[in-house]
UniProtKB/Swiss-Prot annotation:
PANTHER family: 30S/40S RIBOSOMAL PROTEIN S3, SMALL RIBOSOMAL SUBUNIT PROTEIN US3C
Function: Binds the lower part of the 30S subunit head. Binds mRNA in the 70S ribosome, positioning it for translation.
SMART domains in UniProt: KH (SM00322)
Family membership: Belongs to the universal ribosomal protein uS3 family.
Keyword annotations of the record: Ribonucleoprotein, Ribosomal protein, RNA-binding, rRNA-binding
HAMAP family per the UniProt record, alphabetical: Ribosomal_uS3_B
Compositionally biased region (Basic and acidic residues): 215-226
Name of the coding gene: rpsC
Protein name stated in the entry: Small ribosomal subunit protein uS3
Stretches assigned to the KH type-2 domain: 39-107
């Protein structure tokens, strides 16, 4: 099952948080979901070259807050914050209610699965060989600290008449392990031969139930093994005179 299901949805509430954070009632659920879809679709299309890795939408009783996590936040903010004000006005007109927009920088773009997938898709649209594009991003991800990465491309690869799927794996990507912190991204490359789908899985390490990384636990175990063991206390078997 872990091989088929979306690894992000499988780990929600375990080591992954929701991207839409609000509590609706029966009447407002459909309206809120539609607003979230409009916001995400618009931002993904307009800010594609800013490298948007994630969009978090939070709601309170009277307020809506949109947090955009991007690799190149300067493109979104603009000169002296002019572009972000235009973006805010556009989103308010789109959903018909006041909102605030926050921008955060994606500091590790090399191991962000969504950005890696979009990078491969962009290279395929520029007619770069798909194997070269896949191996390049996998090398960059491992340099960035990824424990494992899997990249899959599907479609008319290299202009072949019959569509097929090819994938490469470096390191380990334990999809069945729920405590494994796995990021997943998907992108599409629109080429002259048709649409090519790109999927990326990145394994960033294991997180224990209490939130302690597995690497820290290993170091603690090594430190415990290095400590010299004390000799057991000798019991005085002789009788006191």
């Amino acid at each position: 099952m872990g091989q088929k299901v979306n690894p992000i949805g499988l780990r929600l509430g375990i080591n992954r948080n929701w991207e839409s954070r609000w509590f609706p009632n029966f009447k407002t659920a459909a309206a809120y979901l539609g607003e979230d879809h409009k916001i995400r679709t618009y931002l993904k299309k307009e800010l594609y070259y800013a490298g948007v890795s994630n969009i978090v939408i939070e709601r309170t009783a009277k307020r809506l807050r949109v947090t955009i996590i991007a690799a190149r936040p300067g493109i979104i903010i603009g000169k002296k914050g002019s572009d972000i004000e235009k973006l805010k006005d556009t989103l308010q007109a789109l959903v018909g209610k006041p909102l605030s927009v926050n921008i955060k920088e994606e500091k590790k773009a090399q191991i962000s699965s969504q950005l890696v997938a979009e990078n491969v898709a962009t290279q395929l649209e520029r007619r770069v060989a798909f194997r070269r594009a896949m191996k390049k991003v996998m090398q960059n991800a491992q340099r960035g600290g990824a424990k494992g990465i899997k990249v899959s491309v599907s479609g008319r690869l290299g202009g072949a008449e019959m569509a097929r799927t090819e994938w490469y794996l470096e390191g380990r990507v334990p999809l069945h392990t729920l405590r494994a912190k796995i990021d997943y991204g998907f992108a599409e490359a629109h080429t002259t031969y048709g649409c090519i789908g790109v999927k990326v899985w990145i394994f960033k390490g294991e997180v224990l139930t209490k939130g302690i990384p597995a690497e820290v636990k290993e170091e603690q175990q090594k430190e415990g093994a290095r400590r010299p063991k004390r000799a057991p206390k000798r019991e005085n078997s002789g009788k006191a005179e």
